[in-house]
């Protein structure tokens, strides 16, 4: 069972959660979009899509850490520069092997539960994420993976996938490298 308590301290909200699982959101971000290159750094109301998503994800009561995962390509240096300037955690890995990038980022952060989201979803509702995490942790069925993308019931841009590290590791070990 998970118990949550929100405390206000000097105008800031401190979230306290009783859970023995390290929960890490990994945000997939790249500049080389085919339809709208550089869209994750496009600004809406003075903030980039990545910044809006970061703010939204920080409102989650369940997430311990948020990582922006981008490629090692030079074109993605702009994402790195923004994240560094804003103090966001960033991981750089393979551009083509996204599964490898996620696995390495999750491993580096000792993640036990991973939330996969895309940086071009700035309006993602953190309560949806918290609800999905809660199901994964507390449901009597022993889930390894949850998604709200397989049977699209939420509006586009509210998509998330949540998995255990064991499920990610298994996918990483058994995926075809073709």
Predicted features along the sequence, with ranges:
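Conserved donor-nucleotide/metal-binding helix-loop-beta segment in metal-dependent transferases, i.e.
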Residues: 127-149
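Active-site acidic Asp-centered loop
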Residues: 117-119
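Short aromatic/hydrophobic "clamp" motif used to bind/position activated sugar donors
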Residues: 114
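Conserved donor nucleotide-binding strand/loop of the catalytic core
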Residues: 84-96, 107
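Acidic helix N-cap motif at the loop->helix transition within catalytic regions
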Residues: 75-82
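Short beta-strand-to-loop element that shapes/binds the nucleotide-sugar donor at the catalytic cleft/hinge
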Residues: 146-160
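N-terminal glycine-rich phosphate-binding loop and ensuing alpha1 helix
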Residues: 20-70
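Conserved nucleotide-sugar donor-binding
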Residues: 111, 160-170
């Amino acid at each position: 069972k998970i118990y949550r308590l929100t405390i206000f301290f000097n105008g800031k909200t401190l979230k306290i959660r009783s859970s023995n699982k390290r929960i890490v959101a990994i945000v997939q971000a790249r500049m080389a979009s085919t339809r709208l290159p550089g869209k994750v750094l496009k600004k809406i109301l003075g903030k980039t899509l990545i910044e809006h998503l970061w703010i939204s994800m920080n409102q989650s009561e369940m997430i311990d850490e948020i990582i922006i995962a981008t490629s090692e390509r030079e074109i993605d240096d702009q994402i790195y520069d923004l994240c560094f300037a804003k103090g966001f955690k960033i991981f750089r890995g393979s551009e083509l092997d996204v599964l490898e990038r996620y696995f390495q980022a999750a491993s580096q952060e000792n993640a036990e539960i991973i939330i996969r989201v895309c940086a071009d979803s700035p309006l993602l509702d953190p309560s949806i994420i918290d609800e999905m995490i809660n199901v994964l942790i507390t449901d009597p069925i022993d889930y390894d993976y949850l998604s709200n993308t397989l049977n699209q019931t939420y509006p586009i841009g509210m998509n998330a996938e949540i998995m255990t590290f064991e499920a990610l590791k298994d996918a990483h070990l058994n995926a075809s490298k073709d």
